[in-house]
């Protein structure tokens, strides 16, 4: 139970990063919604002005989420807490995973600001990871398919 609470907390911190950037940029947004087995989302109530603004919002989540993971790491090392160290691993993993340049993932939105072809590269990377057996998670397969549809 404590690990589950920590996971929800780290996901909340990640989403709060998006919300803080939206507040700073004057973008209205909806309350956070948890999506079972996937994570959470905060929807923008207006489209970003341009791809760079979308990329800034996308980058806010992994930045604050990674800081949350660092806090868990520091706390885990200082207190020798296996729980905090495990949560740090989870935090690093979800933020790194979220930076894959695929479709609706944060990395896909950031890469899309750099080049319209970045989504194709992300799909190639994701497909290669699946083909090589590096990722065997059915939820990732769904994300990859949705990214292909979106690209």
Where are these regions (language model features)?
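Hydrophobic transmembrane alpha-helices and their immediate loop junctions
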Residues: 1-151
């Amino acid at each position: 139970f404590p690990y589950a609470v920590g996971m929800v907390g780290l996901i909340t911190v990640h989403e709060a990063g998006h919300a803080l950037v939206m507040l700073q940029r004057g973008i209205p947004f909806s309350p956070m919604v948890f999506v079972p087995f996937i994570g959470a989302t905060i929807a923008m109530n207006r489209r970003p002005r341009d791809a760079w603004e979308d990329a800034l919002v996308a980058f806010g989540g992994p930045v604050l989420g990674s800081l949350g993971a660092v806090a868990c790491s520091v706390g885990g090392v200082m207190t020798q807490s296996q729980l905090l160290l495990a949560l740090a691993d989870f935090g690093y993993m979800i933020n790194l995973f979220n930076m894959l340049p695929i479709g609706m993932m944060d990395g896909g939105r950031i890469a899309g600001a750099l080049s319209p072809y970045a989504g194709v590269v992300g799909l190639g990377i994701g497909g290669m990871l699946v083909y090589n057996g590096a990722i065997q998670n059915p939820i990732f397969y769904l994300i990859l398919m949705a990214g292909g549809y979106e690209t």
